[in-house]
From Swiss-Prot:
The protein's annotated pathway: Purine metabolism; AMP biosynthesis via salvage pathway; AMP from ADP: step 1/1
The protein's Enzyme Commission number: 2.7.4.3
Protein name: Adenylate kinase
Name of the encoding gene: adk
UniProt cross-references to InterPro entries, sorted A to Z: Adenyl_kin_sub, Adenylat/UMP-CMP_kin, Adenylat_kinase_CS, Adenylate_kinase_lid-dom, P-loop_NTPase
Lineage: Bacteria, Pseudomonadati, Pseudomonadota, Betaproteobacteria, Burkholderiales
Class of enzymatic activity (EC top level): transferase
Cellular compartment(s): Cytoplasm
Known role: Catalyzes the reversible transfer of the terminal phosphate group between ATP and AMP. Plays an important role in cellular energy homeostasis and in adenine nucleotide metabolism.
Family: Belongs to the adenylate kinase family.
GO molecular function: adenylate kinase activity; ATP binding
Amino acid sequence: MRLILLGAPGAGKGTQAQFICEKFAIPQISTGDMLRAAVKAGTEFGVAAKKIMDAGGLVSDDIIIGLVKDRLTQPDCSKGYLFDGFPRTIPQAQAMKDAGVPIDYVLEIDVPFDAIIDRMGGRRVHPASGRTYHIKYNPPKVEGKDDVTGDALIQRDDDKEETVRKRLQVYDDQTRPLVEYYSSWAAQANAADKVKAPAYRKVSGTGSVEDITTSIFAQLK
């Protein structure tokens, strides 16, 4: 099972990725984790990436693809792998295709943006313990106060509506076009392609966690 998981920030990808990885006994591959591991290990790509990051630059897609190919040779990838947060752009998706990285499914968890803003904007956190509440779905017993200590709850900057809207706009501009990219590839696949076009699947990310998981497993057959 080799798949790419797509979905806007706040769509619940992280939760569902855990269930998918457990069911199919595959690792979740994140480019951030790969970069940190490669830099720590001092690999060829890690050294190159560190130079760029130390200078405040963005690591090139070529280096990321090199890291991906190295990572996929590890024994834990023998049954497959799940990409979460990569590719983010069409050039990255094209680079993966050109490099011959095989993918069986592209799975999109679809949640309306208004629902994501409601989900994330309502979060409140107790900083000392990490306890999380939601003003609508999981409110504290006393408004604005932690149930255990009575301390004031905060709204993280990442959860403020303005920040959430900006992140959703970036997703809409950069990552949502991947849906069309993969759909078109599947429809126009040709013999010259190094790898077979992945099947595109879309599930609704609204509803209970269990229902969403059931829908996902029904699509991944």
